[in-house]
Amino acid sequence: MSEGLVRFGVEDGIAVITMDDPEHRNALSLTMRRGLRDALERFNTDPACQVGILTASGSQVFCAGGDLKEMAEHQIGVPERTFVPILNRNLWIDKPIIAAVNGIAFGGGFLLAMMCDLAVAADHARFAMPEAKWSRGAPWSIPLHSMMSQRVWMELALTGDPIDAQRAYEIGFVNRVVTPDVLLSNTMALARRIRDNAPLTVRATRQMIYMAAEMGRTAAWDVADHLFEAVYRSEDALEGPRAFREKRAPQWKGR
């Protein structure tokens, strides 16, 4: 299904959200931002979707960032907190989503890759936070404190210089680097591995990992215990060991 500048499709429980404005390098115009928010909300509320993939059409640009021409035309000063959909900040998603970065991811494109739970990058992809070059800001980059070292983050933010996919992998920003021809298939394979696991455990684990980045160890342990109570009491918690005993694939119900 096509919705403006953002396409949305579902295949075997995996939603693929595709930015599709290559003429404007998938810049985050108002139309693109609205399309992304709508697609992400649809992914979160559709019970048929277990895992999401965020990518872009073409092979050169994932997202070049904010639409600076639009910003200049409308004299955008301080962006509203909801200016760009940011997962776990102004848009709450409880399902895992993977970025399939097919090219340049600058500024807001860097943000989109960062906000996903996992990232797979084509080997020619490049990442940058160029806000310092244009007197903009990157308050959205706060989650990087738990993704990379302070000095790596500092260099990216203060210089605005791009890094290649291999460097992004070395600093822990992306999980895998692959050739462009297998980017989507590799990302789909990763998504299927997650999809096939117990959905309640996947979602609770995802939430636990994010909370651990914000809390002290003891507090995080207590919250994690509470999170997994619902998992342990679920029908799926009985189905897993039963399937293991019967030597068959589990049939998850998500309850």
Where on the chain are the PLM-derived regions?
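C-terminal alpha-helix plus adjacent terminal tail
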Residues: 1-12, 47, 160-166, 185, ...
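Glycine- (often His-adjacent) and acidic-residue-rich active-site loop
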Residues: 5, 56-92, 133, 215-216
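Terminal peptide-recognition signature
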Residues: 17, 21, 35-36, 54, ...
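Short, active-site-adjacent cap segments at secondary-structure transitions
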Residues: 59-63, 106, 209
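Hydrophobic alpha-helical segments typical of transmembrane helices
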Residues: 82-87, 140-143, 152, 204, ...
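Crotonase-fold acyl-CoA enzyme core
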Residues: 91-200, 233-234, 238-242, 248
